[in-house]
Amino acid sequence: MTPTSDATTMTTPAGAAAPRVGFVSLGCPKALTDSELILTQLSAEGYQTSKTFEGADLVIVNTCGFIDDAVRESLDTIGEALAENGKVIVTGCLGAKAGKDGGNLIQEVHPSVLAVTGPHATQEVMNAVHTHLPKPHDPFIDLVPGAFGEAGIKLTPRHYAYLKISEGCNHRCTFCIIPSMRGDLVSRPVGDVLKEARALFEGGVKELLVISQDTSAYGVDVKYRTGFWDGKPVKTRMLELVQTLAEIAEPYGAWVRLHYVYPYPSVDEIIPFMATGRVLPYLDVPFQHSHPDVLKRMKRPANGERNLERLQRWREICPDLVIRSTFIAGFPGETEQEFEHLLQFLREAQIDRAGCFAYSPVEGAAANEIPGMLPLEVREERRARFMAVAEEVSTARLQKRVGQTMQVLVDKSVGLGKKGGVGRSYADAPEIDGLVHLLPPEKASKTYKVGDFVKARIVGTQGHDLVGQPV
């Protein structure tokens, strides 16, 4: 496996051979932000990154442990790094997972790793690095401040970035082990979040993706206390955070996109603000299922029976609203009737972008004890049926875009044709949604620049994507 891109290459004092660190980041955007913090701190202390395991003095692997496939990938990557380098520090969600004998899983499988930490453990990782690869001393580099709360090294393209507003989760969904690895909800101080956001916009970010385990619950742990930003009071709450982010983004013409938003009644307050256009009318809402009995077995928060009603009300207020969601098919005990209820919900809710997992037992999850585990072939068959309906809904909604003029953020400068491009509209988050394939501009001299916004008339569809002609 190739370590993280050399976009993170760090400067070294003249004449000094700086120690080199290989880095691999696995898992979700929340893990990616942890990686960015570690890499920023490494840079601040004068370490360099290596493109290869062999060329590094040691390797850091940031792991994922949410589902079995992710566990296997993480363990395989650690093994590869050990084979090619021999000195490996492990961090991330898998680092907090116990093995069969009650000890640490990673140390049971790979006892030669140098150190293991859980997620969101920048200082612990740095302590391990200092132990096994002492940092170079430089009087100028040593004055660089710490990275937390500031915009440091980013692993995303320059024009978009993830902004993590909290760590952990207060829910105990039966299929999930994240709280056991990342702990209960801890909201970042609102002033730190806003400071990082402004630094990102100043650095050229055109799209800010707000992430957490539960964005809607931001501030619950601190009882929505009032913080300060630019000398003004700002409540530690999702609505006030989003309003202030929009205010900061406006001079830069940048987008603000919300992810992991649970359908609490408090989200109703955000929708009118989305209708003004100051924040993208896009919500990533993890519904997981629609049937009340399945939701109870899942121990999902919020009132699932009213989700359809809530969605319809949101779209009445904000007709341009796009909903992305993820679901689980074949959860233990799911009957055919309950699954049909889910398919009907998908049709009626008109979910723009839907993903689905066939239920897979996760070691340590309470759902493993629920009676009625379905055969794998039934779970996979239901996932396939779900995705067929999801594609029908998505295709119909995409077709309605034909003839519209949309703002597109350019991700690639070469696409369909010699001077075409690829970008995304407000309806598409990076990596998980569709694209807008931009046809070559009518003026031969005009080209697309990554990170620019262009207006495009939608002239067709292409699978999950749109095709646009610049105007």
Swiss-Prot record:
Entry annotated with the keyword Iron-sulfur: yes
Catalytic reaction annotation: L-aspartate(89)-[ribosomal protein uS12]-hydrogen + (sulfur carrier)-SH + AH2 + 2 S-adenosyl-L-methionine = 3-methylsulfanyl-L-aspartate(89)-[ribosomal protein uS12]-hydrogen + (sulfur carrier)-H + 5'-deoxyadenosine + L-methionine + A + S-adenosyl-L-homocysteine + 2 H(+)
UniProt keywords, alphabetically: 4Fe-4S, Cytoplasm, Iron, Iron-sulfur, Metal-binding, S-adenosyl-L-methionine, Transferase
Subcellular locations according to the entry: Cytoplasm
Protein name per Swiss-Prot or TrEMBL: Ribosomal protein uS12 methylthiotransferase RimO
Domain (Radical SAM core) ranges: 155-396
Gene Ontology MF terms: 4 iron, 4 sulfur cluster binding; aspartic acid methylthiotransferase activity; metal ion binding; protein methylthiotransferase activity
Listed EC numbers: 2.8.4.4
Residue stretches making up the TRAM domain: 399-471
One of the GO BP terms on file: tRNA modification
Function: Catalyzes the methylthiolation of an aspartic acid residue of ribosomal protein uS12.
NCBIfam families: 30S ribosomal protein S12 methylthiotransferase RimO (TIGR01125), MiaB/RimO family radical SAM methylthiotransferase (TIGR00089)
Cofactor names: [4Fe-4S] cluster
Keyword Metal-binding: yes
